[in-house]
């Protein structure tokens, strides 16, 4: 679906979303000490992830099967991943609370974006999607939105409340709405230097 207009109400897509939402709901109903149960649910929800991430419930996924987590990565409460197309999250990625990754996009022109009426009387619209990549060793603080088409470079930190609409180069501290690079992360940022 990357970059192509599609109907999100397609019956096959509806079934995939329903499955992911049911699995996420089951996961969200578990307690933190039910590790084995959580692991089994995540294996089904995220079938393309080899090592299951540490996810604090609640979590929400559009499909799950389009999200790939690397080793030792995780997300705090209220992680939302609208994974219409691939979302790659690298190794050692920390995701703070209330972070949304949104790959779906809608056309800018109203005549392309507006709802349409099918012959059977049902309504639909069209959308497209762009992938998201978060490279290894990144930290996304709280209340961040990452939009489709973005790559966050290795070792970068995204400040709380940011809306990331453009790619961020490696080893950058970036903040704001829209998110902008403030400076490069260097050896001077080591805790022992503070």
Which positions does each model-derived feature cover?
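Residue-level recognition of short, solvent-exposed, well-ordered loop/turn junctions
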Residues: 1, 133-135, 153, 169
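Flexible, glycine/small-residue-enriched loop-and-beta-strand segment within the central core
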Residues: 59-69, 74-150, 177-178, 184-194
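Short, T/G/N/S-enriched strand-turn elements that build extracellular solenoid repeat scaffolds
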Residues: 44-45, 67-69, 168
């Amino acid at each position: 679906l990357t970059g192509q207009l599609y109907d999100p109400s397609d019956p096959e897509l509806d079934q995939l979303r329903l499955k992911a939402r049911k699995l996420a709901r089951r996961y969200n109903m578990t307690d933190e000490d039910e590790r084995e149960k959580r692991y089994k649910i995540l294996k089904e929800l995220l079938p393309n992830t080899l090592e299951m991430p540490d996810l604090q419930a609640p979590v929400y996924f559009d499909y799950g099967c389009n999200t790939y987590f690397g080793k030792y990565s995780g997300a705090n409460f209220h992680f939302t991943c609208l994974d219409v197309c691939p979302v790659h999250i690298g190794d050692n990625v920390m995701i703070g609370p209330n972070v949304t990754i949104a790959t779906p996009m809608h056309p800018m022109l109203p005549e392309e974006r507006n709802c349409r009426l099918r012959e059977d009387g049902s309504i639909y619209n069209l959308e497209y999607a762009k992938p998201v990549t978060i490279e290894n060793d990144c930290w996304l603080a709280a209340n961040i939105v990452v939009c489709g088409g973005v790559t966050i470079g290795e070792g970068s930190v995204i400040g709380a409340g940011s809306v990331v609409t453009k790619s961020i180069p490696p080893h950058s501290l970036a903040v704001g709405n829209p998110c902008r690079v403030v400076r490069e992360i260097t050896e001077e940022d080591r805790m022992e230097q503070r």
